[in-house]
Amino acid sequence: MIKIRFTHRLLPVLLLALCAFAPRGFTQTPPTFSQVVVFGDSLSDDGNIRHLLEDQYFISYPGGDYNYSDGRFTNSSDTDPSSDLYAGTWHEQLERDFLGLPVATNSLDGGTDYAFGGATTADGTSSRTVISNPTPFGGGQLSVDVDNMGKQVQDYFDDRTPDPAALYILWGGGNDLFDDHSASHVTETATNVAELVKTLARAGARSILVPNVPPLGVVPHYKDDPETAAALNAASATYRGELNTDLDAAVATLSGEGITITLYRLDVYGLFYRLAANPEDYGFTNISDSAQGQPVDPDQYLFWDDLHPTTAGHHQIAAAAFDLLSGTAPAPAQALNISSRLDVGTGEDVLIDGLIITGSGAKKVIVRGLGPS
């Protein structure tokens, strides 16, 4: 079977899949929202990219012909191997299984999920190239323009009146850093997200969920490229800090304008290391390889392809988001009780949470019990 690949990594790393908190031993009171509105990339796209490709090229991708769940960059009961436990992306599982709300379907078919695989946090559109074309095209390249998150928000305003009782999700940044992980671009990406928070709030949004990104270099795609993996991990860590700072400033600015919002910050970066330290606690036996097309149980794998999580991974993100919304997630300043080995980068001096590691070679460290997170 010929596969389609996007040269600019459709998913910000799906790696996200990883985030999760330990099993719950207490009663949680779910928050009440009227609906969920989603802006993002392939981690949250449940049909917009497929809609575009069907319209322009008569290709149902992602879909069953390419061993993906229908319209989603993950697995399902009809993929090889099939999932027996979970269905849908993280926000679909959050809405359906945790919040008891209707699922936000893709916006091009009339729903409130405006996410597009390949989207960045910028305005306008991004041109993504599809290669290894299937029959009957027989080679060459296909391009598709996807709505970036700034345009997604504007399209939402054009379509609907903002609902103050809704939960708004803004999850991007992965594709931005995949495209360019320079320090200046990391700063620009964090600024973009904070500006979108202010834009939504000024229009009437009052509950906004903003995840950061996991260490992007841990996805299977970079297993054999340690230098790029280390650079992406470093950029992800920097983004985590800069996003927090920019969100603090955004909330302060809005408060000065008389606008009060509830801002939920999902620390996917920190959540990954909790999962990596004890994957078996979350039902995983493999958190480094892709399950797609392999004779394995995908419900025990974190990754479906070389970038995106399985529905089991998506489930852990949904569970972590619900803990956050319910006020039962670990406090951000709580120490991470973990032990994890990772590459942190190259260069004469590498900064790791306030420590400078000297030397010009690649640094490998074992992180134990870091705090605060």
Please provide the spans of the model-predicted regions.
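Intrinsically disordered, low-complexity segments enriched in polar/charged residues with Gly/Pro
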Residues: T7, G293-Q294, L342-D343
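A sequence-level detector for low-complexity, Ser/Thr- and acidic-rich stretches
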Residues: K198, L209-P211, V219, A320, ...
